[in-house]
Amino acid sequence: MRDMTPGPDLSGPQAADEFQSDPYAPEVGELPEQSAQDSEKVNKTGTTTIGISTSDGVVIATDMRASLGGRFVSNKNVQKVEEIHPTAALTLVGSVGGAQSFIRTLRAEVNLYEARRGEDISMKALSTLAGNFARGGPFFAINPILGGVDDDGHHVYSIDPAGGVMKDDYTVTGSGLTVAYGTLEDRYEEDMTNEEAKEVAAASIKAAAERDTGSGNGIYLADVTADGVDINGYDFDELL
């Protein structure tokens, strides 16, 4: 017996669009929406991070603590500074997942940039690239420091969550920045060597850790020169 049930209406514009769509087009999902309530469940670096331009290169310092909702210490040995280029390093500030994703994405883009152009990326171009990704990507409130060395000299940049890029001789980001800035500005001198800058940075991180619940448990130092990036972790007592 013939089925007389009417089939779907194929005459409307919506139906036409469905049948005319490219069968080979990728199916693009939506970016996940994150709320303030969700952020309470996210591992965050809390953090105090410092970048100092020196006569030798750049020194970057961070504490080691990660927290949940700013109240519970979830990890006491987080490396919050990573090599992003053979002569540049970037700190992790904000949600751990967002910062790690940001670094992976930026590394890939730097490799692509250099492969296409056949030359090393400049720190100015790298900072611009980082700012563009911070503004346009789903990296959830990151605020890193970029420090690097190129043919034009030694450079330190702070990158805000909206993609703003600011260059300075030294900078601080993270939850302990107000305390760290006080110590850093008191001890900073122009044309410091990397060794001198390490001591100043360590003292500034320790001062922040005394008052900021999101910072503490030791320090990672990145020594950035034209020869490369060297990153090591220390207890405060080893440096001060």
Curated annotation (Swiss-Prot):
Localization of this protein: Cytoplasm
Enzyme class: hydrolase
Propeptide position ranges: 1-46
Residues at the catalytic site: 47
Region named Disordered: 1-48
EC number(s) given by UniProt: 3.4.25.1
GO molecular function: threonine-type endopeptidase activity
Entry keyword set: Autocatalytic cleavage, Cytoplasm, Hydrolase, Protease, Proteasome, Threonine protease, Zymogen
Gene3D superfamilies: Glutamine Phosphoribosylpyrophosphate, subunit 1, domain 1
Principal localisation: cytoplasm
GO cellular component: cytoplasm; proteasome core complex, beta-subunit complex
Summary of activators and inhibitors of this protein: The formation of the proteasomal ATPase PAN-20S proteasome complex, via the docking of the C-termini of PAN into the intersubunit pockets in the alpha-rings, triggers opening of the gate for substrate entry. Interconversion between the open-gate and close-gate conformations leads to a dynamic regulation of the 20S proteasome proteolysis activity.
Catalysed conversion reaction: Cleavage of peptide bonds with very broad specificity
Cytoplasm listed as a keyword: yes
GO-annotated biological processes: proteasomal protein catabolic process
PANTHER family: ATP-DEPENDENT PROTEASE SUBUNIT HSLV, METALLOPROTEASE TLDD
Its biological purpose: Component of the proteasome core, a large protease complex with broad specificity involved in protein degradation.
HAMAP family in alphabetical order: Proteasome_B_A
Family recorded in the similarity comment: Belongs to the peptidase T1B family.
Subunit organization: The 20S proteasome core is composed of 14 alpha and 14 beta subunits that assemble into four stacked heptameric rings, resulting in a barrel-shaped structure. The two inner rings, each composed of seven catalytic beta subunits, are sandwiched by two outer rings, each composed of seven alpha subunits. The catalytic chamber with the active sites is on the inside of the barrel. Has a gated structure, the ends of the cylinder being occluded by the N-termini of the alpha-subunits. Is capped at one or both ends by the proteasome regulatory ATPase, PAN.
Protein name, entry field: Proteasome subunit beta 1
Annotated source species: Haloarcula marismortui (strain ATCC 43049 / DSM 3752 / JCM 8966 / VKM B-1809)
